[in-house]
A protein has these predicted regions:
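A short, surface-exposed alpha-helical micro-motif characterized by mixed small hydrophobic
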Residues: 65-67
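Conserved H-loop
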Residues: 53-61
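Hydrophobic anchor residue at the start of the ABC signature
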Residues: 13
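ABC ATPase "signature
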Residues: 83-84
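Helix N-cap at the start of a conserved alpha-helix in ABC-type nucleotide-binding domains
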Residues: 35-37
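Catalytic Walker B motif of ABC-type/P-loop ATPase nucleotide-binding domains
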Residues: 24-28
Length: 117
């Protein structure tokens, strides 16, 4: 039988942790997962971070950032344009955009180059 995307992610995560990895580098780890599986993975990431495992992951899913990120690094065309604590990142762009934008709203403004990085 073939593993679901969620089971594949969990399998590879378990494999890395079996070697006592202190750093996990994951490319779009929740992409293609259903909402329940995505929430389960984010919970696993939070628990691992609480235990001292550093997790670096790329994503286009802003809800993952809202749930898991301590730090957000914005990279465009291979160049780091912004890197800061999540709260500072949101605060900076909230001042620039005004109101109470969600992280997704902020990312849309950045992508449309409506704000200054």
């Amino acid at each position: 039988t073939e593993l679901s995307e969620g089971m594949k992610v969990k399998f590879y995560l378990t494999l890395a942790l079996s070697h006592h990895a202190k750093l996990l580098i994951l490319d779009e780890p929740t992409s293609g997962l259903d909402p329940v599986s995505r929430d389960e993975m984010n919970e696993i990431f939070r628990k691992l971070a609480d235990k001292g495992v550093a997790i670096l992951f790329s994503t286009h899913i802003t809800s993952d950032l809202e749930k898991c990120a301590d730090t957000i690094t914005y990279i465009k065309n291979g160049e780091i344009l912004q890197s800061s604590k999540k709260e500072d990142f949101i605060s900076h762009y909230t001042k620039e955009i005004g109101g109470a934008p969600s992280l997704e709203d902020i990312m849309v403004h950045i992508e449309r180059e409506e704000v200054i990085l």
